[in-house]
């Protein structure tokens, strides 16, 4: 098992990796809309969604993968009223 880490996404806050490569599968930890350079949360749901996806892409890139390789995700939305906005960006 290999731990995946990149400075192009926020560092893990606990004793876990940004991603783990098990040989056949890469498991990514959750990503927030945090700027990896400053640690600041992006302003608003649109900017947070874009930043979270940018962070995920950076972790995947470090593992030699892209979003095309992703087969499952779980998305948490604090306000269900933002679901349409998140889904539009995410889709």
Could you tell me what each predicted segment is?
Residues 1-91:
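Short, polar/acidic, helix-capping and beta-turn segments at strand->helix junctions
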